[in-house]
């Protein structure tokens, strides 16, 4: 009995552990599918999904990004290839391979229970997929248990299919119609790969092959819609482009729902070998782009000719083909037979908030919201400007917000002709907007007349709140410069608008608007003496016409100190929300340019959360770096040449000095020798030279054959001492 239980346990363990191969794990689609499957228990989709499980799964999917790198027991073990040898191994993968030979790859495939080949992202993978299914089919006789081969293809192999009902073009295609499908001209290789997989997949019991035709994939990092997300998020264009009339219907599916379909194929091993994976939506290109623009962009779209789509450098031919397809499809078998925990069953538009959240989290595009406060002349604006440039944030100053809001209201009130190609606003709504804008302008004018040109807090708070809730600030974030100044201003600005109870009890956490509340509060400060000295040293050109004039500055400084004495300061408000300010005493840093303060704030805030440098900015940075390098090299070369010239001059000077000293030494030696040779000369002239000269003269007169012998004989005979 015990042995049977042990055998059953082992069998269960074998069943519950499956090794899954997926190609190109470092790509968008394969990566998300692999991550999803690595968190799925083998066989889980065979059980019916209850409402409670769906709620739990929603919470689980939100935490998918932070999933543990450790392989969980009973889940699919993911292995696969990488597109680049230097790509990092995904955390969810047990093994990865790159630059591997076909022989070695086949050995790896034979170790797996499920082989998934994704041909939606790289046309180069089709030939390898056909080879893989062919090679595996030849090894069927050696299989110990059944293996599954899943080809992840695209609905573009249906793009030119004839309508099922000529009189009703809205009748969707289903899996049952796969024999009637006609491919887009650019996807003929895809449909050939599908046919090959279906051919091999029906030959053997131990080898089942499936084709899953997926719609345009979205979700997570954005997929093929990422270009539109990026354009909207950056906010650099007034309207998102729609290619053509935008009425073409695009079959779509969330990438995690596609992963759910694959999970069900693995668990259920269905009878149909061709499946369609699309959501229930019937969205047009215009619907999708308009939804993106409204929820994370300028809110407008602009229809442009299809030909202009090819000028968009970030869109590949493959992306354009998917975006311009006009095809209605229904995943009938998937909907009726599979248990899928849908992420976006109703489609892209209905789930845009969740999709946007995934997109921003996956790409690290969370906004950075900063509030910089402090006394006048402490350096708020200069520091805010530097931080805004570094983090690519919107620098918000009160005067600019007010001017912009009033200008916008005046533009609404002024007659506005609707241009050709723009969307017309309904007349009733337009009239209502004009009336509201005119009423608000009248109120602003009256308020400024009654307050000596100053605006009431109610208008300031309204304009500031609208600015902080604008799409650019929601996307990239903001740096709020010198506002709010008081506790009440902060409370009115950041508290929830729909708050029913106004409780003035301090010390409790008020409900605040998470959309606009700052993440970092920077409290700059310095002594009054330091601030006065800084203002005194400012150039007259900067001081003229600003609040830095002596009377206005002293009054502003006094007001700031007065409102920050009691326990109801603006800093207390943030403390109550547990957003503790970063206090920096600028006066103690002794840095006129505030570099140390900026460096300290960057350290506290962290790295930027954006797309980084654009191609143009990278090129500009590279150009500047090249110029700096050339200038540095030129300076180094000039310095080297100068150093060599100096060294050569010093060498010549030393040589000349040495020669001069040598000549001096020689002269001294000559003088010494001359001084030493005087007695010798005197001796020679007295005792030797007279006789020698006579002998030489005599030798010249006689001219003997041997003059030397003659001279010697002469000197011997005429030696004065001998005589």
Swiss-Prot record:
Primary localization: cytoplasm
EC number in record: 2.7.4.3, 2.7.4.6
Tissue: Expressed in sperm and airway epithelial cells (at protein level).
InterPro entries, A to Z: Adenylat/UMP-CMP_kin (IPR000850), DD_AK7 (IPR047499), Dpy-30_motif (IPR007858), NAD(P)-bd_dom_sf (IPR036291), P-loop_NTPase (IPR027417)
Root EC class: transferase
Keywords noted in UniProt: ATP-binding, Cell projection, Cilium, Cilium biogenesis/degradation, Coiled coil, Cytoplasm, Disease variant, Flagellum, Kinase, Nucleotide-binding, Transferase
Location of region: Adenylate kinase: 367-612
Subcellular location: Cytoplasm, Cytosol; Cell projection, Cilium, Flagellum
Signal peptide boundaries: none
Annotated binding of ATP, by residue: 377-382, 587
UniProt feature coiled coil, ranges: 46-458, 609-677
Region feature NMP, mapped onto this chain: 397-455
Region (LID): 537-547
Protein name: Adenylate kinase 7
Region described as DPY-30: spans on this chain: 679-723
Swiss-Prot/TrEMBL catalytic activity: AMP + ATP = 2 ADP; a 2'-deoxyribonucleoside 5'-diphosphate + ATP = a 2'-deoxyribonucleoside 5'-triphosphate + ADP; a ribonucleoside 5'-diphosphate + ATP = a ribonucleoside 5'-triphosphate + ADP
Transmembrane parts of this sequence: none
Binding site for AMP: 432-455, 482-485, 489, 555
Similarity section: In the central section; belongs to the adenylate kinase family.
Molecular function per GO: (d)CMP kinase activity; adenylate kinase activity; ATP binding; nucleoside diphosphate kinase activity
GO biological process: cell projection organization
One GO CC annotation: cytosol
Entry function: Nucleoside monophosphate (NMP) kinase that catalyzes the reversible transfer of the terminal phosphate group between nucleoside triphosphates and monophosphates. Has highest activity toward AMP, and weaker activity toward dAMP, CMP and dCMP. Also displays broad nucleoside diphosphate kinase activity. Involved in maintaining ciliary structure and function.
Disease linkage: Spermatogenic failure 27: An autosomal recessive infertility disorder caused by spermatogenesis defects that result in multiple morphologic abnormalities of the sperm flagella, including short, irregular, coiled, or absent flagella.
């Amino acid at each position: 009995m015990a042995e049977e239980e042990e055998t059953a346990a082992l069998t269960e363990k074998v069943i519950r552990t499956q090794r899954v191969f997926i190609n190109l794990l470092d790509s968008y689609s394969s990566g998300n599918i692999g991550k999803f499957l690595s968190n799925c228990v083998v066989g889980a989709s065979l059980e019916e999904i209850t409402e409670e499980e769906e709620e739990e799964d929603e919470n689980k999917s939100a935490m998918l990004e932070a999933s543990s790198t450790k392989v969980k027991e009973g889940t699919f073990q993911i292995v696969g290839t990488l597109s680049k040898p230097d790509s990092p191994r995904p955390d969810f993968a047990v093994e990865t391979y790159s630059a591997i030979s076909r022989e070695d790859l086949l050995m790896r495939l034979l170790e797996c229970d499920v082989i998934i080949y994704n041909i939606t992202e790289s046309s180069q993978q089709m030939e390898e997929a056909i080879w893989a299914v062919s090679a595996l089919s030849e090894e069927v006789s050696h299989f110990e248990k059944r293996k599954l081969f899943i080809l992840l293809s695209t609905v573009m192999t249906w793009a030119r299919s004839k309508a099922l009902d000529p009189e009703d073009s809205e009748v969707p295609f289903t899996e049952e119609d796969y024999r009637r499908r006609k491919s887009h001209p650019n996807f003929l290789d895809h449909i050939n790969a599908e046919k090959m997989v279906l051919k091999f997949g029906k030959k053997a019991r131990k080898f089942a092959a499936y084709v899953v035709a997926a719609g345009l994939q979205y979700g997570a990092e954005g997929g093929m819609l990422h270009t539109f997300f990026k354009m909207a998020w950056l906010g650099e264009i007034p309207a998102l482009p729609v290619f053509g009339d935008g009425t073409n219907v695009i079959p779509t599916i969330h990438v995690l729902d596609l992963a759910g379909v694959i999970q069900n194929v693995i668990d259920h091993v269905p009878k149909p070998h061709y499946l369609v994976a699309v959501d229930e939506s019937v969205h047009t290109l215009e619907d999708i782009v308009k939804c993106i623009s409204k929820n994370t962009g300028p809110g407008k779209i602009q229809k442009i000719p299809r030909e202009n789509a090819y000028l968009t450098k970030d869109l590949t031919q493959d992306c354009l083909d998917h975006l311009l397809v006009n095809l209605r499809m229904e995943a009938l078998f998937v909907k009726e037979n599979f248990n899928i925990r849908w992420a976006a069953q109703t489609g892209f538009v209905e789930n845009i908030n969740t999709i946007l959240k995934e997109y921003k989290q996956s790409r690290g595009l969370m906004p950075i919201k900063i509030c910089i406060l402090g006394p006048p002349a402490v350096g708020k604006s200069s520091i805010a400007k530097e931080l805004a440039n570094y983090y690519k944030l919107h620098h918000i100053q009160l005067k600019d917000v007010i001017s912009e809001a009033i200008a916008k209201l005046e533009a609404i009130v002024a007659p506005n002709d609707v241009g050709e190609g723009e969307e017309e606003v309904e007349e009733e709504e337009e009239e209502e907007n004009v009336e509201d804008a005119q009423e608000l302008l009248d109120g602003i004018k009256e308020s400024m007349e009654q307050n000596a040109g100053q605006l009431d807090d109610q208008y300031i708070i309204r304009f500031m709140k609208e600015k902080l809730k604008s799409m650019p600030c929601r996307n990239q974030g903001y740096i709020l410069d010198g506002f709010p100044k008081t506790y009440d201003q902060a409370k009115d600005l950041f508290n929830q608008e729909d708050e029913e109870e106004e409780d003035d009890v301090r010390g409790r956490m008020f409900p605040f608007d998470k959309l606009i509340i700052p993440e970092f509060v920077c409290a700059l400060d310095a002594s009054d003496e330091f601030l006065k000295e800084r203002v005194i040293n400012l150039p007259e050109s900067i001081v003229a016409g600003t609040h830095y004039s002596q009377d206005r500055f002293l009054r502003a400084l006094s007001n700031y100190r007065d409102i920050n004495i009691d326990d109801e300061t603006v800093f207390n408000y943030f403390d109550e929300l547990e957003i503790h300010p970063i206090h920096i005493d600028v006066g103690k840093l002794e840095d006129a340019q505030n570099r140390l303060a900026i460096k300290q704030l960057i350290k506290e805030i962290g790295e930027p959360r954006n797309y980084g440098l654009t191609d143009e900015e990278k090129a500009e940075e590279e150009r500047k770096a090249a110029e700096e390098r050339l200038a540095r090299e030129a300076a180094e070369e000039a310095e080297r040449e100068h150093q060599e010239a100096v060294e050569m001059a010093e060498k010549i000077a030393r040589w000349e000095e040495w020669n001069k000293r040598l000549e001096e030494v020689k002269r001294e030696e000559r003088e010494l020798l001359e001084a030493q040779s005087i007695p010798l000369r005197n001796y020679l002239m007295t005792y030797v030279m007279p006789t020698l000269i006579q002998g030489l003269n005599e030798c010249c007169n006689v001219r003997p054959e041997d003059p030397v012998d003659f001279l010697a004989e002469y000197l011997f005979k005429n030696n004065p001492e001998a005589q």
